[in-house]
């Protein structure tokens, strides 16, 4: 059973970056914009990120780091934090998923799950 005091939702919008990609060299660039929304009952600070990136061939890369794009935002109740970043893959299709480690105002650490989302070159999926 989840505790409603610690509820953070994550939404993602992705975009293929044709101008930064080199398909002939198996280089496919993607941008993603993420909104982290605090639906809990306490302000929470985003401490760190953990990404699992899987390309179309099944190769997996894990990325861990502090904050997001150099920030560790404090997200107040009912507020959100939006940022953009990107990744480069060697296949036209892949997916990302992971979590953010959050620190609530009362000192409790908890994970905000980032559900799997697809990265795909337009027209690459039938």
Curated annotation (Swiss-Prot):
SUPFAM superfamilies per UniProt: ApaG-like
Domain ApaG stretches: 2-126
One Pfam family per UniProt: DUF525
Gene3D superfamilies, A to Z: ApaG domain (2.60.40.1470)
Top-rank taxon, per record: Bacteria
Listed GO biological process terms: error-free translesion synthesis
Family matches, as InterPro entries: ApaG_domain (IPR007474), ApaG_sf (IPR036767), Uncharacterised_ApaG (IPR023065)
PANTHER family: F-BOX ONLY PROTEIN 3 (PTHR14289), POLYMERASE DELTA-INTERACTING PROTEIN 2 (PTHR14289:SF16)
Name assigned to this protein: Protein ApaG
Species name: Pseudomonas syringae pv. tomato (strain ATCC BAA-871 / DC3000)
């Amino acid at each position: 059973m989840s505790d409603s005091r610690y509820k953070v939702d994550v939404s993602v919008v992705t975009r293929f970056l044709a101008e930064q990609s080199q398909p002939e060299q198996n280089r496919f660039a993607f941008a993603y914009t993420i909104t982290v929304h605090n639906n809990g009952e306490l302000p929470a600070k985003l401490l760190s990120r953990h990404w699992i990136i899987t390309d179309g061939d099944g190769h997996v890369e894990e990325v861990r780091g502090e904050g997001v794009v150099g920030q560790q935002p404090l997200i107040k109740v009912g507020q959100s934090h939006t940022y953009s970043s990107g990744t480069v893959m060697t296949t036209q299709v892949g997916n990302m998923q992971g979590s953010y480690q959050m620190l609530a105002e009362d000192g409790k650490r908890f994970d905000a799950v980032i559900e799997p989302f697809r990265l795909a070159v337009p027209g690459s999926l039938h």
